[in-house]
Amino acid sequence: MALLQISEPGKSLAPHQRRIAVGIDLGTTNSLVAIVRDALPKVLPDAQGRELLPSVIRYLPNGRTQAGFEALESVVIDPKNTIVSVKRFMGRGLLDVEHIESAPYDFVDQPGMLKLRTVAGDKSPIEVSAEILARLRQLAEDSVSDEIVGAVITVPAYFDDAQRQATKDAAKLAGIEVLRLLNEPTAAAITYGLDNASEGVYAVYDLGGGTFDISILRMSRGVFEVLATGGDSALGGDDFDHRLYCWVIEQAKLPPLSIHDHRTLLQACKHAKEQLSHNPLARVHETLADGTVVNVGISQAQFFEITQNLVTKTLMTCKKALRDAGLKAEDVKGVVMVGGSTRMPNVQRAVAELFGTQPLNNLNPDQVVALGAAMQADLLAGNQSKDDEWLLLDVIPLSLGIETMGGLVEKSIPRNTPIPVARAQDFTTFKDGQTALAIQVVQGERELAQDCRSLGRFELRGIPAMAAGAARIRVTFQVDADGFLSVSATEQGSGVKASIDIKPSYGLTDAEITRMLQDGFASAKEDLLSRSLREEQVNAQRLLDAVQTALDSDRSLLNAEEQAAIDREMTTLQKILNEETNSAVVRKAVDQAVKATDDFAQKRMNASIQKALSGKNVTEI
């Protein structure tokens, strides 16, 4: 008699078998894939033992692609078809990309995103990133000889919704199931915190090839709570390379270079920058296509001087993050350094001076993010015991809200709110009989919608006609653990509902994010004055509309003199509303108009009561 094997529904026939999930650090310069083996995270090497995969893709005329080190060899000889630093283009349009004029590519600006023209056709940054992710997936599958159930992919903390969505789309193209998008500093904190059993407040300073992030976290018994985050999604090692390149051009008095010579010299500058991390002197020595020899020496001190403003920008962001967390630099127990660009001595020294402590360098800055992602992937795959689990509490970088009457912003979720989160607020209609409501979702720190970034618009239609202010419309914001936003609006009485998943065409630029926060502080007083004026203007318009409605229905209650007096007061109020910029003056005019219409309001009330009581006796009242 055959024995039947019985298992729980949904369970593997081998319950001891681990589900393989990987952590992927999709970097600007290099990418890595890691898994957890024997309870320890490990970066997977390729067949040659190399753990870093250069984030470079080359397109060939025959439809083939080269990736990693193979493609890197063609950066100089085939610059138009060899795509580097594609992460800087993710979720962005042409106007969003810095130093676009120095890039060697032929860009195609299409609605929704830019594309790069290659011999294999126009390629989007999503498609290029998908090629990199596909190579990492193949590397992982070859290493474990098993199916990969999913991946945790890391992104800069300051990636906006468009950039995060682009990353998920690239993973989908590469055949990878995304278990979660994890902020890079948070991934690094997981690695450091679990590796060192650390508790207390820590900063994660993440300076990669194309992005910068700073996160302030509190680590405590398996809980990783992000207190504040800041960053610049277009500042990284590439910018240091570009600054050195411009300096060499100036020193050598070179004319504008061809695409080929530009790539040649830029690669030489990158190599010199890396040498200066370990040597006091370096030399940029290259021969250009026309035979011109470029031979320029540079010292560490000179390099520090020409790149100091880039380092200072990162420090300013660190100070802002500390303020947002309500902390001082001395409250930070340690600073975890992440990203290859943190190897630069001037960066190490500047961070040490700001926080008053030597940065923590006991973990490889190139690997720490991928290792943390692997541990989170292993947890999400269900391989960790209850005792090994931990909790991540990440935050959103900028406030979210909607535009209300008068162009004001009502913030529903303040910046640095832990995610996932859902918040609801009730709003109402402005005019009598209003049956639709246009809702604009905005992101930023200013008081007026025009000064914030618009994320999307949608309309709620089918609101039952009723008096202004009678409808109750509940607007709900939801931000998931990956940082994706959805907004819904429901009219409470009828149940009419509308919603939107926010998918902006282009992402926020670093300048916009920095400006939003700085303007929020620098313009606080001005914003409050503007908000006060808008509020009084809304009150004035509401009164004008209400009086006009009353006159249309009950003008017969007034004699000619009373009508003329109210008309004069309304004309004066309308003139002040159109011309006045002082909220106190508008408020005074509204108060006067209210007084001028008090008798009319009383007459309408009396008439209404008289009408209601007409034909009834005392016993019916």
From Swiss-Prot:
Any one GO biological process: iron-sulfur cluster assembly
InterPro entries (alphabetical): ATPase_NBD (IPR043129), Heat_shock_70_CS (IPR018181), HSP70_C_sf (IPR029048), HSP70_peptide-bd_sf (IPR029047), Hsp_70_fam (IPR013126), ISC_FeS_clus_asmbl_HscA (IPR010236)
Gene3D superfamilies: 1.20.1270.10, 3.30.420.40, Actin, Chain A, domain 4, Substrate Binding Domain Of DNAk, Chain A, domain 1
Keyword Nucleotide-binding (UniProt): yes
GO terms of molecular function: ATP binding; ATP hydrolysis activity; ATP-dependent protein folding chaperone; unfolded protein binding
Any Pfam family matching the protein: HSP70
Signal peptide (residue range): none
KW ATP-binding (keyword) present: yes
Keywords: ATP-binding, Chaperone, Nucleotide-binding
Top-level taxon of origin: Bacteria
Protein purpose: Chaperone involved in the maturation of iron-sulfur cluster-containing proteins. Has a low intrinsic ATPase activity which is markedly stimulated by HscB.
Family stated for the protein in its record: Belongs to the heat shock protein 70 family.
Record-linked HAMAP family: HscA
Protein name: Chaperone protein HscA homolog
Organismal lineage: Bacteria, Pseudomonadati, Pseudomonadota, Betaproteobacteria, Burkholderiales
